[in-house]
């Protein structure tokens, strides 16, 4: 079951991010999120903006992620490639953390809510790269996040897109 996150969920959300940061460090990616990303203030902003979602299985928190519909400023410029489609509206997955027992469920849910889905990840985040590629995302190029660091950019088009004749 998916639902919007609430401030009352913050303790559980913070715990899953602690586990995710540890898993990232254990897999050779200790710097992407460091010790404190995402900060609680950003999560509260995501909650207040109705863009932080939870994935629950049998009442237990399985995953948390930001799902944002509309243009992402960091995706306006892409290097060493191009987006699969740069004219359709798109959704973006950010700050995905999960217990890892149901890989792909978040991506499937997001694709039910948009025609085009984008994501980005750090070059050292082999787990996320594998998840995206296993779920049919195409590596499109390199974008730079707000602090200027590069990220590998991915995109997937929904398989349920209606035929467009124009």
Task: Please place each PLM-identified region on the residue numbering.
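Conserved acyl-donor/pantetheine-binding loop and adjacent beta-alpha core of acyl/acetyltransferases
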Residues: 66-101
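Conserved catalytic-core motifs of GNAT/GCN5-like acyltransferases
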Residues: 120, 138-152
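A short beta-loop-alpha structural element at the N-terminal edge
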Residues: 1-15
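Conserved GNAT-fold acetyl-CoA-binding loop/helix
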Residues: 22-41
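Conserved GNAT acetyl-CoA-binding A-motif
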Residues: 92, 113-124
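Conserved acetyl-CoA-binding loop-helix of GNAT-fold acetyltransferases
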Residues: 95-112, 129-134
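Conserved beta-strand-loop-alpha-helix junction that forms the acyl-donor binding cleft
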Residues: 98, 119-130, 147
